[in-house]
Curated annotation (Swiss-Prot):
Effect of P124L: In BARTS3; decreases channel conductance
Ranges that cross the membrane: 51-82, 91-111, 141-160, 161-180, 236-255, 282-310, 325-342, 400-420, 421-440, 500-520
GO CC, one annotated term: basolateral plasma membrane
Name of this chain's protein: Chloride channel protein ClC-Kb
Glycosylation sites (chain numbering): N193
Transcription is among the record's keywords: no
Activity regulation (UniProt): Activated by extracellular Ca(2+) and inhibited by extracellular acidic pH.
GO BP, one annotated term: renal absorption
Length: 687
């Protein structure tokens, strides 16, 4: 039914609806409508990417907060069950062990049944995808649901497994960004843009870290260091915007949930601000960094060896292939039995959560000095006001419990990384590093009970500062990152130890990077994911090695004047994804690239008159509509390995053709690059 229209009195004759004419306050409503249209026009001038990034940050903060609330409820239920079940050691042992075993079995079985790619950290796979490799199902939305459920069960196990959520949240954020990107392209009808999708995934990786620690700065820098070797400034801005939105919403939700009175740091500390450390202590911080570098290299070596042993052992490999939940349950039973509080768990502070571990380890008081003349009791129930009591035993003392914690957690963390379920491995090594620093600081405070004299002034040593440096240094050594120093400052809200912590992280990285690949690179190697190794150092001769020394000379070219029967023979006898297109068989001048799939489709679409036997050539197929691609990049035989490697990393390339005076003479792919780099680092023995 058509609406009645009228003419507004004194108007120029433009028709208006009677509803608008007789409605209340027509001028105000028209002004509001015009203002909204103006605001919409101004907002969308910025581009929809910024709204996309803000939505991504807010959604991931909601997921992180909801997961924390759900996990906290399950952990409280476990604690209540353990506390109320009675004094029977058997029942208490069963309540302590069966609970995490059931959760881990469900986590492993559920995630693996939905999609096998949901297990593990996810960062190695994301790193591989950002390098341009297509991994099926890793960005599927069903993978998102499986990983959320599995990770929630993993975190609900508490200190028995001692695992975190940083890596999985990076993977979850990337999956959410990919899904939102697909929704956007479907809604506005724009074609899929791989370059734009990659930009969003890079920003999403920063959001994953920011929504776990509420640390936008270190989230962006950590994602840069872990995910890529070259980074665009344009992605830098996007990453900071999305990470800030996610971190702000994450802490805002904590305020709304009455967890905090206002937006504050994640872990509370009370370090001295006036004189946090004396100048001679710089040497001890550097020594702590060196120790963390050595222990980090040992951890990476043992983790990779043990992972290979589990995969090659007949019993464990069969379990992992056929009964992943059974292997997960057995490994969890071992870990839960060790952490049972009345037994060895008494010396591992197993009643503390990971957050409480850090809160206690960052305490600025010296436990060794506090327990010299008095022995604090070990309470039947956990005392939130005296968390450090969990680290004390009258026979073992503080030094014994910390040392026992480091020895046991070293192999327990390695065992936990082999369980096929969604889990993060950054937070455990962060806590482990804090324990290293705490033991180092307690030792110094015991040796220098009055402090170190500098400039006639004596200030007591703060072991909490060394715990902070140890957390940043050890986690930085394992992941080969420097941003862990900034992360330590953001999560504690303290920057008074900026210089010594940074020096410790640099010392740890200098040792670890020269000995072992990072945790994520090692996982890529063990899982046999496609990767391009980095060229370490500047003095290994990468500038002297030329492309002509390692390129693949045996390439199959397609000439425009090649008969169709020859083209068919080439296509059926090879399985390469693309062929170099040359001007003629004689000249071999490279003029383009032909995709195998498109060429096969064009050959199948030809009429019978084009069958083999007729003197038709490839040029006719190309003229009939078979698409070709221009050669935008190519290498020269004189190009150095160093230049070629930088080009591959910068543009996420997988292969390039090599031309000499325009003639196609070879190609270089990741296979040839890996072999050339391997020959530089480990020269073959002379024949």
């Amino acid at each position: 039914m058509e609406e009645f229209v009228g003419l507004r009195e004194g108007s120029s004759g433009n028709p208006v609806t009677l509803q608008e004419l007789w409605g209340p306050c027509p001028r105000i409503r028209r002004g509001i409508r015009g203002g909204l249209e103006w605001l919409k026009q101004k907002l969308f001038r910025l581009g929809e990417d910024w709204y996309f990034l803000m939505t991504l940050g807010v959604l991931m903060a909601l997921v992180s907060c909801a997961m924390d609330l759900a996990v906290e409820s399950v952990v409280r239920a476990h604690q209540w069950l353990y506390r109320e079940i009675g004094d029977s050691h058997l029942l208490r042992y069963l309540s302590w062990t069966v609970y995490p075993v059931a959760l881990v079995s469900f986590s492993s079985g559920f995630s693996q049944s939905i999609t096998p790619s949901s297990g593990g950290s996810g960062i190695p796979e994301v790193k591989t995808m950002l390098a341009g490799v297509v991994l099926e199902d890793y960005l599927d939305i069903k993978n998102f649901g499986a990983k959320v459920v599995g990770l929630s069960c993993t975190l609900a196990c508490g200190s028995t497994l001692f695992l975190g959520k940083v890596g999985p949240f990076v993977h979850l954020s990337v999956m959410m960004a990919a899904y939102l990107g697909r929704v956007r392209t479907t809604t506005i009808g724009e074609p899929e843009n791989k370059s734009k999708q990659n930009e969003m995934l890079v920003a999403a990786a920063a959001v994953g870290v920011a929504t776990v620690f509420a640390a936008p700065f270190s989230g962006v820098l950590f994602s840069i260091e872990v995910m890529s070797s070259h980074f665009s400034v344009w992605d830098y801005w996007r990453g900071f915007f999305a990470a800030t939105c996610g971190a702000f919403m994450f802490r805002l939700l904590a305020v709304f949930n009455s967890e905090q009175e206002t937006i504050t740091s994640l872990y509370k500390t009370s370090f001295r601000v006036d004189v946090p450390f004396d100048l001679p202590e710089i040497f001890f911080f550097v020594a702590l960094g060196g120790l963390c570098g050595i222990l980090g290299s040992a951890y990476l070596f043992c983790q990779r060896i043990f992972f290979g042993f589990i995969r090659n052992n007949r019993f464990s490999s069969k379990l992992l292939a056929t009964s992943k939940p059974v292997y997960s349950a057995l490994a969890t039973l071992v870990l839960a039995s060790i952490t049972y509080p009345p037994s060895a768990g008494r010396f591992l502070a197993s009643r503390l959560s990971m957050k409480q571990h850090l809160d206690s380890l960052f305490d600025n008081h010296s436990w060794a000095l506090m327990t010299q003349n008095s022995s604090p009791p070990w309470p039947e129930e956990l005392d939130p006001q005296h968390l450090w009591w969990e680290w004390y035993h009258p026979r073992f003392t503080i030094f014994g419990t910390l040392a026992f914690f480091l020895v046991m957690k070293f192999w327990m963390l390695i065992l936990a990384t082999t369980i096929p379920m969604p889990a993060g491995y950054f937070m455990p090594i962060f806590v482990y590093g804090a324990a290293i620093g705490r033991l180092f600081g307690e030792t110094l405070s015991f040796i220098f009970p009055e402090g170190i004299v500098a400039g006639g002034i004596t200030n007591p040593i703060m072991p909490g500062g060394y715990a902070l440096a140890g957390a940043a240094a050890f986690s930085g050594a394992v992941t080969h990152t420097i941003s862990t120093a900034l992360l330590a400052f953001e999560v504690t809200g303290q920057i008074v130890h900026a210089l010594p912590v940074l020096m410790a992280v640099l010392a740890a990285n200098a040792i670890a990077q020269s000995c072992q690949p990072s945790f994520y690179d090692g996982t890529v190697i063990v899982k046999k994911l496609p990767y391009l190794p980095r060229i370490l150092g500047r003095n290994i001769g990468s500038h002297r090695v030329r492309v002509e020394h390692f390129m693949n000379h045996s390439i199959t070219t397609l000439a425009k004047d090649m008969p169709l029967e020859e083209v068919v023979k080439v296509v059926t006898s090879t399985d390469v994804a693309k062929y170099p297109l040359v001007e003629s068989t004689e000249s071999q001048i490279l003029v383009g690239i032909v995709r195998r799939a498109q060429l096969v489709q064009a050959l199948k679409a030809e009429p019978p008159s084009w069958a083999p036997g007729h003197q038709q050539c490839l040029q006719d197929i190309l003229a009939a509509g078979c698409p070709t691609e221009p050669v935008t990049l190519k290498l020269s035989p004189e190009t150095s390995l160093h230049e070629a490697h930088n080009l591959f990393e910068l543009l996420n390339l997988h292969s390039l053709f090599v031309t000499s005076r325009g003639r196609a003479v070879g190609c270089v792919s990741w296979v040839e690059m890996k072999k050339a780099i391997s020959n530089l680092t480990n020269p073959p023995a002379p024949k």
